[in-house]
Curated annotation (Swiss-Prot):
Gene3D superfamilies: 5' to 3' exonuclease, C-terminal subdomain, 5'-nuclease. The keyword DNA-binding applies. One of its GO terms (molecular function) is 5'-flap endonuclease activity. Keywords: DNA-binding, Exonuclease, Hydrolase, Nuclease. Residues 166-256 form the 5'-3' exonuclease domain. It is an enzyme of class 3 (hydrolase). This is 5'-3' exonuclease. The lineage of its organism: Bacteria, Pseudomonadati, Aquificota, Aquificia, Aquificales. GO terms for biological process: DNA replication, Okazaki fragment processing. InterPro entries: 5-3_exonucl_a-hlix_arch_N, 5-3_exonuclease, 5-3_exonuclease_C_sf, DNA_polI_H3TH, FEN, HhH2, PIN-like_dom_sf. 5'-3' exonuclease acting preferentially on double-stranded DNA.
């Protein structure tokens, strides 16, 4: 079975920046996010030897969720300038390395990942998603796994049930009930994880709660119907995206090795230069390009 590896690029970059101490070239250009991102990427390539790999980024344009709810993710701090300047460099390196990258204006990386996972799992691919984002757990199925790159935790259907008490397809219902402070998703006041699990055992889904709202509100007098409807719209991933991709589009291409090494030299990343030679020589010998 063919395997498609999907990396949540925005999350990788963000976490690399804050996980590592400040690093910069002798000219003062910041490099910690670049270094951390490439370390994780090269480690994945060495371990998994992927043939199909895509890195997905959030697009800079306003998203559909922000249009629905102006306060969505509003309390998240804006990316600092030393992080912002590193993102175009990471994208340039990916292109030089022959690794497909994808972003779609109006949609978050999560939505593009959801689209890819659904489309290519239906085509018979095994899909492995590398991201710490719990929203993506709604995609887990027999042929779709989510791996947290921070601790290598692998989420199968059984693992999702054990950790959250609900099946993967119920994760949006669960998150709509409990809310998400990080993303500013309101949820239902007074409903925590245990209560949400019990609610879903009784009602089955957010859709069914809304159909039986009077009964539900007698149990939870502080609940607001509009909050639940909004929360579900915010946590449910979009998969009906207007893009067409083939298997070939997601295949790792032959790298421009000279320019790639030149770029790493500019960034003064000597340790990664050695890895690049080793990784792409092995890939060439396996005739992946």
């Amino acid at each position: 079975m063919k395997t498609l590896y999907i990396l949540d690029g925005s999350s990788f970059v963000y976490r690399s920046f804050f996980a590592l101490p400040p690093l910069s070239t002798s000219k003062g250009f910041p490099t910690n996010a670049i270094y951390g991102f490439l370390r994780m990427l090269f480690s994945l390539i060495k371990k998994e030897r992927p043939q199909y790999l895509v890195v997905v980024f959030d697009a800079p344009a306003k998203t559909k969720r922000e249009k629905i709810y102006a306060d969505y993710k509003k309390q998240r701090p804006k990316a600092p300038d030393p992080l912002k300047v590193q993102i175009p460099v990471i994208k340039e390196i990916l292109k030089l390395a022959g690794i497909p990258l994808l972003e779609l204006p109006g949609y978050e990386a999560d939505d593009v990942i959801a689209y890819l996972a659904e489309k290519f799992s239906q085509k018979g691919f095994k899909v492995k998603i590398y991201s710490p984002d719990k929203d993506l757990l709604q995609l887990v199925s027999e042929n779709v796994l989510v791996i947290n790159p921070m601790n290598d935790e692998v989420f199968t259907k059984e693992r999702v049930i054990k950790k959250f008490g609900v099946e993967p397809q119920k994760i949006p219902d669960y998150l709509a009930l409990v809310g998400d402070k990080v993303d500013n998703v309101p949820g239902i006041e007074g409903v925590g994880p245990k209560t949400a699990i019990n609610i879903l055992k009784k009602y089955g889904s957010v859709e069914n709660i809304l159909k039986n709202w009077e009964k539900f509100q007698r149990e939870f007098p502080r609940a607001k119907k509009e909050d639940l409807e909004l929360s579900y719209k915010l946590v449910k991933l979009y998969t009906d995206l207007d893009i067409e991709l083939s298997e070939e589009d997601l295949k790792i291409k032959r790298p421009d090795l000279n320019k790639l090494k030149q770029k790493l030299q500019e960034l003064e990343m000597k340790s990664l230069l050695k890895e690049v030679d080793k990784i792409f020589r092995q890939a060439s010998q396996r005739s992946l390009f």
